[in-house]
């Protein structure tokens, strides 16, 4: 049973007025009586719409600078009244049934995001009447439609036209879910903001207490269900943040290929975040969340050719990310050379998409061009808890490096050192990266001892016939012993970049001097677990 309910009277009170005039016009044209408040009522009246101010309906004026507008029994009785059950009491108190409530809330998030926002500004942008109406209407969804998203306006009018001015219970229930999600997210933002003021806020003090609130409330929106998770016996879904401000796998548009898997999304994120580190045309190939080949070149085709050479075996079935538009020539090189799961780039030419379309299983994503990296939080779930930290956006430049050995690096060694240092940031610890002429030639990832990561990087370079002599090596953390330097020297490395900070730094530096290796300290670590 559809349990349709006709919409005869609607209350409209919105902060974000995008589309509200057109929606109100459509409702009015279908015989819906309009109630409204404050600025919304004035806007509708200016547009020539017949609208009744809520204060005229209730006989009670807005007061306290707008703090009290809709908190009245004639409003909430009209929303909460159960049709067929509360009709007599509503008639006795001259309460009119309100069949639709259209509300969005004061812009609290935008207010507190503004530089210099005071606590008083934040407090005045905490909506009280709005969430109360939203919750009332959502609770009584059996009889009332609650609309909190302007993106629903058109669909609502279409359904009313298809149902003689009525909405079905299924629609009202879906709108109620959106409403409760909306108020939950709103309250979470307020709780997080106030939580970050504790314990510093006492009376006149307005200094924030720290980066993290005492209670962390998170709101993510489900983008898609997955066939399964990391493994086939695990169920999974992909959730995204609302209003993501940076180009990412969460904001990317899939323009081709079958549905993304859980592992596809995780690996694509790793590849894209790595390629963002480079200003020059760059390519990153990822397998199991680790870069297996990275290069910069005079074009993305050149970068891809060089990245692929690092480890063609691991590149099979990998994820490829670019920081420039995917062109036809590069697309052809990829398709003719290897099996690839996902290609992601800021954009893709029509010719490139025609080429990749020949391989139906290849997923192509475009994410738009990115600007500066946006600070945020990283989360790691542990049994019974959640680890939270700032995103690792740290990176050093040449001017911040310290040469700690007798020999200075050459210009090319320095360029390669900075290049592989960027790559090492995205390799699972313990991470060792060999690079020469702006391409990786060997990557040792995820080993329990740093020396074995160094050995693996050398083995990979030798297996592919890549010359290590004269290369630079990056280590994501300090060398606890000299053995990693000895292994690098045996492979042919002539420059090392690492954080420093070991109690055996002197021993490690001495080993570098013995081998004639130039060593640079970054004083910044990039563990990745």
Curated annotation (Swiss-Prot):
GO terms for biological process: 'de novo' IMP biosynthetic process. It catalyses: (6R)-10-formyltetrahydrofolate + 5-amino-1-(5-phospho-beta-D-ribosyl)imidazole-4-carboxamide = 5-formamido-1-(5-phospho-D-ribosyl)imidazole-4-carboxamide + (6S)-5,6,7,8-tetrahydrofolate; IMP + H2O = 5-formamido-1-(5-phospho-D-ribosyl)imidazole-4-carboxamide. Residues 1-148 form the MGS-like domain. One of its GO terms (cellular component) is cytosol. It holds the Pfam family MGS. One of its GO terms (molecular function) is phosphoribosylaminoimidazolecarboxamide formyltransferase activity. It comes from the Bacteria. The keyword Hydrolase applies. Its EC number is 2.1.2.3, 3.5.4.10. SMART domains: AICARFT_IMPCHas, MGS. The modification N6-acetyllysine is found at residue 287. Pathway: Purine metabolism; IMP biosynthesis via de novo pathway; 5-formamido-1-(5-phospho-D-ribosyl)imidazole-4-carboxamide from 5-amino-1-(5-phospho-D-ribosyl)imidazole-4-carboxamide (10-formyl THF route): step 1/1; Purine metabolism; IMP biosynthesis via de novo pathway; IMP from 5-formamido-1-(5-phospho-D-ribosyl)imidazole-4-carboxamide: step 1/1. Keywords: Acetylation, Hydrolase, Multifunctional enzyme, Purine biosynthesis, Transferase. CDD domains: IMPCH. HAMAP family: PurH. Belongs to the PurH family. The IMP cyclohydrolase activity resides in the N-terminal region. NCBIfam families: PRK00881.1, purH. This is Bifunctional purine biosynthesis protein PurH. It comes from Escherichia coli O6:H1 (strain CFT073 / ATCC 700928 / UPEC). The gene is purH.
């Amino acid at each position: 049973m559809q349990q349709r309910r006709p919409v005869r009277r609607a209350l409209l009170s919105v902060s974000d007025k995008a589309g509200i005039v057109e929606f109100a016009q459509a409702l009015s044209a279908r015989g819906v009586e309009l109630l409204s408040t404050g600025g919304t009522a004035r806007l509708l009246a200016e547009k020539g719409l017949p609208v009744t101010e809520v204060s005229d309906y209730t006989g009670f004026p807005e007061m306290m600078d707008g703090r009290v507008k809709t908190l009245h029994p004639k409003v909430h009785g009209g929303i909460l009244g159960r049709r067929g059950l509360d009709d007599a009491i509503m008639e006795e108190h001259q309460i009119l049934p309100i069949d639709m409530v259209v509300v969005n809330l004061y812009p609290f998030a935008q207010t507190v995001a503004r530089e210099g926002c005071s606590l008083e500004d934040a407090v005045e942008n905490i909506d009280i009447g709005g969430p109360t109406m939203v919750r009332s209407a959502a609770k009584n969804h059996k009889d009332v439609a609650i609309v909190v998203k302007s993106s629903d306006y058109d669909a609502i009018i279409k359904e009313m036209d298809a149902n003689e001015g009525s909405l079905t219970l299924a629609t009202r229930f879906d709108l109620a879910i959106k409403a409760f999600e909306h108020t939950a997210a709103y309250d979470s933002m307020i709780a997080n903001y106030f939580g970050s003021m504790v314990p510093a806020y006492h009376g006149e003090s307005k200094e924030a207490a720290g980066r993290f609130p005492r209670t962390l409330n998170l709101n993510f929106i489900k983008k898609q269900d997955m066939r399964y998770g990391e493994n086939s016996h695990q169920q999974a879904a992909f959730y995204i943040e609302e209003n993501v401000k940076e180009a990412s796998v969460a904001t990317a548009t899939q323009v081709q290929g079958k549905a993304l898997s859980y592992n596809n999304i995780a690996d694509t994120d790793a590849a894209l975040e790595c390629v963002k580190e480079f200003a020059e045309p760059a390519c990153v190939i990822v397998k199991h969340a680790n870069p297996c080949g990275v290069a910069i070149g005079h074009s993305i085709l050149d970068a891809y050719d060089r990245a692929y050479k690092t480890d063609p075996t691991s590149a099979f079935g990998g994820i490829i990310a670019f920081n420039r538009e995917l062109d036809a020539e590069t697309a052809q090189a990829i398709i003719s050379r290897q099996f690839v799961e996902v290609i992601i780039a800021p954009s893709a030419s029509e010719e490139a998409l025609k080429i990749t379309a020949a391989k139906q299983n290849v997923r192509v994503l475009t994410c738009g061009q990115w600007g500066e990296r946006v600070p945020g939080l990283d989360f790691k779930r542990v049994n019974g808890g959640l680890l939270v930290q700032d995103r690792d956006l740290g990176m050093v430049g040449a001017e911040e490096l310290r040469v700690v050995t007798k020999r200075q690096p050459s210009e090319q060694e320095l360029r390669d050192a900075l290049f592989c240092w960027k790559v090492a940031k995205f390799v699972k610890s313990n991470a060792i990266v060999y690079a020469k002429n702006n391409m990786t030639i060997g990557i040792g990832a995820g080993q329990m001892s740093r020396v074995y990561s160094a050995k693996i990087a050398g083995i990979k370079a030798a297996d592919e016939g890549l010359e290590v002599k004269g290369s630079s090596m990056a280590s994501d953390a300090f060398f606890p012993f000299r053995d990693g330097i000895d292994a690098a020297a045996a492979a042919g490395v002539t420059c090392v970049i690492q954080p420093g900070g070991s109690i055996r730094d002197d021993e490690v530096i001495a080993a570098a001097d013995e081998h004639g290796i130039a060593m640079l300290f970054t004083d910044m670590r990039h563990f990745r677990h």
